[in-house]
Amino acid sequence: MSLSPYELEQEWQPRTYVGRLVKEGRIRSLSEIFEKNLPILEPEIVDYLIGPELKSETVDVRLVQKMTDAGRINRFRVVVVIGNENGFVGVGQGKARQLAVAIEKAIRNAKLNIIPVRRGCGSWECLCSEPHSVPFTVRGKSGSVEVILKPAPRGTGLVAGDAAKVVLRLAGIRDVWSFTKGDTRTTINFVKATYNALKQTYKFVTPLDWART
């Protein structure tokens, strides 16, 4: 469970170099971390910097079985998406015998997997210069699923499958055309492919991009 800002300030003892920089106030935003190409190895870093803005949604819950010497053990496998709806999104998976524990693990992993998402107005039909869509066409793949995201004019909405919509919305994308290949019924791959496509938005980076995030 995430700590309140006060509890985080009092109880969090950073174990990594980046964590110490964050708590000491020498790093004040996630953008700084990514600009310096530093790793996020503690979920508390994300809580500390954008915790109040962070939202999470569970997009897939499955009961899976594991064979052991003692027989079959049932566990929940959960996929969670987190984001601040303003340029940052993460996807995480968690497994546990109790659903609540699996969700908590997934949220923790999603924070460790958080990425910046470059937004813009890449559609020739719009040209409003507002960060409402993707700036150019991007592709992502996971397993058999491939997702292609194309810029859409303002007011189009998210033309995508339900699982992909969650990732896009929490990333702060409001308008996009999406095209898919493969078995999108496999939710975990559909979500990861969308996430991987958004990763590509920072394939081409200029210093000005960080100021706009």
Swiss-Prot record:
Residue ranges of every copy of the S5 DRBM domain listed in the record: 54-117
The entry lists its GO molecular-function terms as: rRNA binding; structural constituent of ribosome
Entry keyword set? Ribonucleoprotein, Ribosomal protein, RNA-binding, rRNA-binding
A GO CC annotation recorded here is: cytosolic small ribosomal subunit
Source superkingdom: Archaea
| Pfam families (alphabetical) | Ribosomal_S5 (PF00333), Ribosomal_S5_C (PF03719)
User: Can you cite a GO biological process for this protein?
Assistant: translation
Entry function: With S4 and S12 plays an important role in translational accuracy.
Oligomeric and partner information: Part of the 30S ribosomal subunit. Contacts protein S4.
What family is reported? Belongs to the universal ribosomal protein uS5 family.
Q: Which NCBIfam families match?
A: PRK04044.1 (NF003125), uS5_euk_arch (TIGR01020)
Query: According to its record, what is known about the domains?
Result: The N-terminal domain interacts with the head of the 30S subunit; the C-terminal domain interacts with the body and contacts protein S4. The interaction surface between S4 and S5 is involved in control of translational fidelity.
This chain belongs to the protein called: Small ribosomal subunit protein uS5
Q: Organism source for this protein? A: Hyperthermus butylicus (strain DSM 5456 / JCM 9403 / PLM1-5)
Classification lineage: Archaea, Thermoproteota, Thermoprotei, Desulfurococcales, Pyrodictiaceae
User: What gene does this protein come from?
Assistant: rps5
